[in-house]
Amino acid sequence: MIKLKLLMKSMFLVCVLMLSMVGVSSASVSVTSDSKYFDISSGCFVLEGKVLVKTDTRTIGADKARVNLVTKEVWANGNVYVEEPQEEIKFKGGSVYASDELKTAIIKGDAILERPDITIQAEKCSFNWRTKIAEFSGLVEVHQDGKTNVYDVIQYDVINNKIIDAK
């Protein structure tokens, strides 16, 4: 009987926690996937299959992800993209860590940005959605005007479509 009461209290606390998280996040974050569960130990939703994490201004898509709705952090991998449709910005890669607090998405594993006049490909890209500056590092290839240039690191102004620093 004591075990049953303890189990009921635990389930009640889990439900309250989940409902409070949904209430905090429902105005600004939408999360969908083929399957999901809440991992109590990490405080994250674990998502698999056609994962979409949407805010008012950006979408993260992936095969798998972990999402913390309290800290607004996303860890995702497999066919990852980070998109801001209103700005026509779309990064692709193998994995991403995104943090609302840092206003940054870090894309790793063949990170690519394709624009009408330029394609940038690198091992890693860090995109700050407040400044709209993307920093590419690790064998950076810039395909532009029929030419390919290779750099170690570049900074790219996504709004003005220009490289602002290259090394």
Segments from the language model and where they lie:
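Mature-chain termini and adjacent capping regions
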Residues: M1-K167
